[in-house]
């Protein structure tokens, strides 16, 4: 039997293989079957047809697993072939890609005529048809050459076959997975399907050409001892479709869903997604403007009632809420630039003044309405800033469970101004406006007025005759009572409760309330507060010419933290200028009306201001008296502490003769002196103990001597 090597150049001698390359991947290797026909493979073809009838229910185009399972993807060399043809396989030098062809090695029994006792495939061939085919191949082998393709030895497969033979099939399930493991480098691809086999089987039956012997293969189920289902540990769909998870040949439901979503996203003709409609703020403003225009007449009537109620509430609550004069064109600011707390006090005027302004100018009322709207918006914004305020009404604040905060409790004590009057937790809108007016005036006055610290005022001192602190008349540090801060042109002989204006907030840290004055400054542009005084009070202004007064008041003076008592204002000539109440009110009213364009009388203002000042005078008098008493006690404490430091300094030898010594140095030297005296005391105490011990010893010695002397006298006598 002539054996040919698998080298394509050694096979080209025959004209039948002149146009065929065995290792050409593009050509089907089984095209050789048209030229190579043999009667020895009839049994294998019949087995293949039988298996086709069994697996005809499977769709070959849908799933490739049945074909791969029943049709050989690889042709591993069997143990019988590997035993005898291992050397030839290594000589051939074929790589692992040789498993791509579907021609396996011929068994040892077919080549040499001998049988392998351990071959499972030789034991399984018991049919008569197979034996007759084998005998026909042996007899006709001399005439027709047999082409054998050799492969490299698969050591893993050889070991598995040996284990299977030696175990005798007892551990079939355990070795089955090892047998079907795909060796590294093995190919799962195939070059034909079952349809080609069925088509080519008819052509092979009638052709008479070179005999082609197929080797023993593991795909024949009846030839194997225990044929099992062919399974791989790799998903074979990756070899066909390029993915391990997606089946492109399945139903197109997912593809249809994706296409539908893509069309929906690419369709630009549809309306956008419906969302919650948010109207623009301009629509709301238009509605508010229409409503304000429709209710303009009612607001003019309500404005007059609001002013009357405000005046009554101000009189009852003891607050001075007289409006500041409107500014001129040069001093006016834009509505946007005005502070929100100014809007509440800017729209309130006297009854006659409001009537005149409404009848003469309708634009003023519209501006006031706009200011009210702006103020309400600002207050709503203020509601979200803090959780507690004295200046907000009840309906705008949600205090939750009404828990008492530290600012509501009685634990908050004002040391400077302790009084029995307490503000309500949530005042009404009118009280809120009054408080805002007062606080804004206080802040604006403090910032706008440039006042000297000490300026022409007297410091009356209440002598504390009952104080245990000794007098400091002989001290080098006299008290403020004996040394006023600055000489004044005229002094107040006595203290009068009604002589002090009541416009201060109770929590102010100044020792006496500052007298409010109607001031306008050419260098300071802004709004100034004006207040009306009682008859007999003095008015102080900054560069303001008043009718009926010949002299010009130089400037206003504010009370400092250490001042108390009645304020006296010096003029340029050094004399005071008392002005009557009527002249004062008329001058200010005329000034207001000249700037606002209205004409108002001062009769109603006079009566309301008088009532306010009388009520506020008695209330503030008690508060000022308590504040003065507290300041006196504090002053006495400071004087007593100063005297104690002076006495301590006299006891220290190192700084006794110094005229001035800081308190820190006095304390440091006193500490050193105390330590020195303590050490001296300890030394003296130890010395006393030693001396007492020596005295005791000497007394004992003296007593012993006396006893001896007495004994000697008694013996001699």
Swiss-Prot record:
GO terms for molecular function: DNA binding; DNA-binding transcription factor activity; DNA-binding transcription factor activity, RNA polymerase II-specific; protein dimerization activity; RNA polymerase II cis-regulatory region sequence-specific DNA binding; ubiquitin-specific protease binding. Low levels detected throughout embryo before cellular blastoderm formation, particularly concentrated in pole plasm. Zygotic expression detected during cellular blastoderm stage in endodermal anlagen of anterior and posterior midgut at both poles. After gastrulation, expression detected in invaginating ventral furrow of mesoderm. Continued expression in anterior and posterior midgut and mesoderm during germband extension. During late germ-band retraction, expression remains detectable in fusing midgut and presumed developing somatic musculature. It is found in: Nucleus; Nucleus, Nucleolus; Cytoplasm. Residues 351-360, 462-488 have a biased composition (Polar residues). The keyword ATP-binding does not apply. Residues 639-677 are annotated as: Helix-loop-helix motif. Disruption phenotype: RNAi-mediated knockdown in the neurons, only dopaminergic neurons or only adult neurons increases transcription of the dopamine decarboxylase Ddc and thereby dopamine concentration. In addition, induces male courtship propensity towards other males without altering male sexual preference towards females. RNAi-mediated knockdown in muscle or fat body does not elicit male-male courtship. Simultaneous knockdown of Ddc and myc restores increased dopamine levels and the induced male-male courtship observed in the single myc knockdown. Keywords: Activator, Cytoplasm, DNA-binding, Nucleus, Phosphoprotein, Transcription, Transcription regulation, Ubl conjugation. PROSITE patterns: BHLH (PS50888). Probably targeted for ubiquitination by the SFC ubiquitin ligase complex member ago, leading to its proteasomal degradation. Residues 625-638 are annotated as: Basic motif. The modification Phosphothreonine is found at residue 217. GO terms for cellular component: cytoplasm; histone locus body; nucleolus; nucleus; protein-containing complex. One of its GO terms (biological process) is positive regulation of cell growth. Residues 625-677 form the bHLH domain. SUPFAM superfamilies: HLH, helix-loop-helix DNA-binding domain. The modification Phosphoserine is found at residue 220. Residues 288-376, 462-535, 555-584 are annotated as: Disordered. Residues 298-311, 361-376, 489-523 have a biased composition (Low complexity). Induction: Negatively regulated post-translationally by mei-P26 in a proteasome-dependent manner. Efficient DNA binding requires dimerization with another bHLH protein. Binds DNA as a heterodimer with Max. Interacts with ago. Interacts with lid. Part of a complex containing lid, Myc and ash2. Component of a complex with pont and rept. Interacts with puf. Interacts with wh/wuho; the interaction may be mediated by mei-P26 and may be involved in the regulation of ribosome biogenesis. PANTHER family: MYC PROTO-ONCOGENE. Belongs to the Myc transcription factor family. Participates in the regulation of gene transcription. Binds DNA in a non-specific manner, yet also specifically recognizes the core sequence CAC[GA]TG. Seems to activate the transcription of growth-related genes; required for cellular proliferation and growth. Functions in the TORC2-mediated regulation of cell growth, acting downstream of the TORC2 complex. Inhibits the demethylase activity of Lid. Activates transcription of mbm. Has a role in ribosome biogenesis and endoreplication in fat body cells by activating the transcription of LTV1. This is Myc proto-oncogene protein.
């Amino acid at each position: 039997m002539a054996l040919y090597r698998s080298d394509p150049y050694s096979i080209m001698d025959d004209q039948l293989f002149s146009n065929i390359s065995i290792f050409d991947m593009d050509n089907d290797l089984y095209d050789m079957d048209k030229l190579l026909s043999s009667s020895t493979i009839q049994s294998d073809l019949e087995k293949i047809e039988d298996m086709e009838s069994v697996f005809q229910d499977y769709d070959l185009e849908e799933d490739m697993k049945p074909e791969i399972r029943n049709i050989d993807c690889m042709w591993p060399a069997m143990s019988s072939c590997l035993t005898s043809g291992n050397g030839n396989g290594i000589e051939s030098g074929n790589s692992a890609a040789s498993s791509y062809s579907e021609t396996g090695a011929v068994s040892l029994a077919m080549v040499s005529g001998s049988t392998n006792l351990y071959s499972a495939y030789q034991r399984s061939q018991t049919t008569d048809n197979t034996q007759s085919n084998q005998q026909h191949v042996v007899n006709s082998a001399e005439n027709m050459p047999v082409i054998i393709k050799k492969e490299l030895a698969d050591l893993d497969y050889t070991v598995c076959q040996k284990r299977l033979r030696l175990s005798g099939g007892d551990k079939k399930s355990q070795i089955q997975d090892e047998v079907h493991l795909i060796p590294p480098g093995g190919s799962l691809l195939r070059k034909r399907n079952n349809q080609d086999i069925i088509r080519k089987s008819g052509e092979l039956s009638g052709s008479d050409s070179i005999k082609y012997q197929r080797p023993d293969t593991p795909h024949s189920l009846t030839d194997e001892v225990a044929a099992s289902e062919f399974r791989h540990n790799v998903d074979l769909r990756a070899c066909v479709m390029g993915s391990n998870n997606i089946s492109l040949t399945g139903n197109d439901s997912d593809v249809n869903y994706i296409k539908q979503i893509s069309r929906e996203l690419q369709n630009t003709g549809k309306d956008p997604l419906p969302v919650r409609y948010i109207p623009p703020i301009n629509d709301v403003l238009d509605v508010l403007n229409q409503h304000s225009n429709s209710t303009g007449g009612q607001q003019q009537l309500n404005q007059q009632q609001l002013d009357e109620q405000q005046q009554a509430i101000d009189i009852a609550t003891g607050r001075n809420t007289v409006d500041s004069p409107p500014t001129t064109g040069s001093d006016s600011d834009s509505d946007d630039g005005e502070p929100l707390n100014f809007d509440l006090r800017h729209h309130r005027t006297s009854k006659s003044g409001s009537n005149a302004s409404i009848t003469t100018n309708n634009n003023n009322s519209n501006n006031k309405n706009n200011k009210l709207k702006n103020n309400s918006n600002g207050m709503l914004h203020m509601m979200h800033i803090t959780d507690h305020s004295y200046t907000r009404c009840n309906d705008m604040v949600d205090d939750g469970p009404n828990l008492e905060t530290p600012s509501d409790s009685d634990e908050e004590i004002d040391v400077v101004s302790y009084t029995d009057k307490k503000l309500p937790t949530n005042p009404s809108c009118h009280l809120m406006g009054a408080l805002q007016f007062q606080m804004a005036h206080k802040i604006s006055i403090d910032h706008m007025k440039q006042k000297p610290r000490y300026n022409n005022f007297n410091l009356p001192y209440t002598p504390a005759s009952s104080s245990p602190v000794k007098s400091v008349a002989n001290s080098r540090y006299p008290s403020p009572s004996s040394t006023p801060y600055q000489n004044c042109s005229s002094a107040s002989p006595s203290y009068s409760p009604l002589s002090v204006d009541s416009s201060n907030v109770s929590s102010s840290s100044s020792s006496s309330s500052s007298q409010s004055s109607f001031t306008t400054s050419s260098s300071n542009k802004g709004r100034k507060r004006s207040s009306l005084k009682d008859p007999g009070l003095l008015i102080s202004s900054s560069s303001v010419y008043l009718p009926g007064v010949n002299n010009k008041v130089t400037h206003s003076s504010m009370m400092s933290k250490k001042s108390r008592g009645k304020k006296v204002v010096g003029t340029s000539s050094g004399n005071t200028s008392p002005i009557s109440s009527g002249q004062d009110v008329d001058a200010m009213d005329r000034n207001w009306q000249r700037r606002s364009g209205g004409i108002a009388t001062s009769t109603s203002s006079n009566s309301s201001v008088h009532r306010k000042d009388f009520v506020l005078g008695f209330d503030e008098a008690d508060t000022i008296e308590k504040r003065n008493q507290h300041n006196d006690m504090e002053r006495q404490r400071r004087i007593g502490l100063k005297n104690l430091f002076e006495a301590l300094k006299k006891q220290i030898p190192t700084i006794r003769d110094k005229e001035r010594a800081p308190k820190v140095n006095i304390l440091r030297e006193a500490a050193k002196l105390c330590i020195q005296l303590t050490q001296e005391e300890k030394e003296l105490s130890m010395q006393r103990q030693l001396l007492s011990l020596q005295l005791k010893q000497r007394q004992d010695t003296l007593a012993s001597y006396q006893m001896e002397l007495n004994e000697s006298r008694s013996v001699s006598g």
